[in-house]
Amino acid sequence: MALKFHVLHQSKKSRARVGKIETAHGIIDTPAFVPVATNGALKGVIDHSNIPLMFCNTYHLLVHPGTEAIAAMGGLHKFMNRNAPIITDSGGFQIFSLAYGSVAEEIKSRGKKKGSSSILEVNDEGVWFKSYRDGHKLFLSPEVSVQAQKDLGADIIIPLDELLPFHSDEKYFLSSCSRTYVWEKRSLDYHKKDPRHQSMYGVIHGGIDPEQRKIGCQFVEDHPFDGFAIGGSLGRNLQEMLPVVDVTTSYLSKDRPVHLLGIGDLPSIHATVGLGIDSFDSSYPTKAARHGLILSSQGPIKIANQAYANDLSSLDPECTCATCTSNISRAYLRHLFKVHEPNAAIWASIHNLHYMQEVMKNIREQILNDEI
């Protein structure tokens, strides 16, 4: 079945809302944080049954083991042994972010310079690129991308789009926006021929140009997408991103869920949930965990600091995750990181993912109380 979206409460204070998305593999309470399982796995976490929605990258799964191989095994849900919703991207995000840097990197001023050799050619038909594994030449078109996502069988899929960095010149930027919407229309047409249980979100581009964002919103509104996704360049920092998200959500109808692509750090979530964002995806909590940054109700903890060398308290006294209830102390976790014990990243990742789910639960409660 295609997804069904229900708004349970609209805040009286902002555009924030509490809702639920029904899919063939389960219900997602919104606003929701969506962790990224790049290769079909959450790094450092074995049990993902308590994660309502996971984001898997089509590009990586296309390169290995191959989406046709996964289809032959019954799809991504069976391959991963997951009986809960999955969202996949088009593959375009990974191709272009490997070349230019991701949206999140750009916001943190770490975007790569244009000219990476991973992209060989971009034209109206699609994009030719080199495999990051062996340099093999690959081609991705709207139809190839959607078929790959059909093979994977994700509940929510994304049409092919072109991700440009902030520093693109205006002429190429405008031609890219036009090409993206042609690609999205082709993606949607291909999807509608065989929708199965899947739903497709339309991606809104336009950079930081309000008029181009309005055009993008009009495009997705005029086509039967099941939800909206805000993509493309969102500026160089949070201050530039906020007006982009604000103007974009102001143009969108309220009957479909809105996802913010590639953004899911805590400051961004707190800043944009009131603008009407229903879901966020990011590898932030697991990546932070692998680098020894622990999220907690008392603020972030850099576990390598000497201050925690003899600290036998739990990572977060308010937390009920498997790490904290197993009495893994700050001192012990610091020791594991210092000796490069793999368990360190596992314990930290379990905690950070649980913490993010609790943050979203608290946000939903605040919206219900019209506090956001």
Swiss-Prot record:
Q: Which GO terms describe its biological process?
A: queuosine biosynthetic process; tRNA-guanine transglycosylation
Q: Short name of one Pfam family for this protein?
A: TGT
Q: What EC numbers are recorded for this enzyme?
A: 2.4.2.29
On whether Membrane is a keyword of this UniProt record, the answer is no
Describe cofactor binding as the record notes it.
Answer: Binds 1 zinc ion per subunit.
Q: Where does substrate bind?
A: 89-93, 161, 232
Domain of life of the source:
Bacteria
Q: Has the keyword Coiled coil been applied to this entry?
A: no
Q: What would be an example GO MF term here?
A: tRNA-guanosine(34) queuine transglycosylase activity
Main enzyme class = transferase
Describe its partners and assembly state: Homodimer. Within each dimer, one monomer is responsible for RNA recognition and catalysis, while the other monomer binds to the replacement base PreQ1.
Family under the similarity heading: Belongs to the queuine tRNA-ribosyltransferase family.
* Protein name, as recorded: Queuine tRNA-ribosyltransferase
- Name the lineage: Bacteria, Pseudomonadati, Chlamydiota, Chlamydiia, Chlamydiales
